[in-house]
Amino acid sequence: MNPEKVAETMDGETVQWMSQMSQDRMICGSLSIRENDLFFNRFLAFYQGKLVAQYDKRHLFSYGGEHEVYQAGNQTCVFTFQGFTLAPFVCYDLRFPAWIRKTVLRDELDCPDVLLFVANWPSARISAWDVLLKARAIENQAFVIGVNRIGNDEKGIAHNGHTQVVKYDGGYLLEPHQREAIAHVVIEKSPLSQFRDRFPFLSDADGF
């Protein structure tokens, strides 16, 4: 793991590309950012050329040595887009439900409608990816969008995608698949609101 080779500043080439590509859509993802001589695994979201959300990965993957070269974030992130409230997370964050619940409940009057996970999750542990995405959707009564890479990395570690969209009740709007693809998925807020009104168990959730 060598962020020195790939990290950019916030005015770097990839960040500028994301800004340019967002003129008529929202574009988001994570990349290695260098800031004040520190490295962050940072999620960025752009719309109409402007940065609308920024989140630094909270949980660093110590098994792979990420904690030795990256700085952990310490701030939750929630933002709005076209009437939806969204909360972004990066990869390994998926395994830590307390952090996600803390994000969801930071404003009890406006819990996130969509949880976004961008990931570099290997094939060897893909069953955990599938199960945890469903769990995060069900326990937080939210849509969950999980976007994962595909192909082999420089160490030969295989990644088989399984990008998916999970409903608040655990059903799929987009089932996991093992190919490169562009997916068009429509999510609607009214069924989510009705579901939360009918089963308001978030009001009984533990605070953190």
Segments predicted by a language model, with ranges:
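Short beta-strand scaffold segments in enzyme catalytic cores
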Residues: 29-31, 42-45, 77-79, 146, ...
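CN hydrolase (nitrilase-like) catalytic-core segments centered on the catalytic cysteine
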Residues: 10-28, 95, 100-182
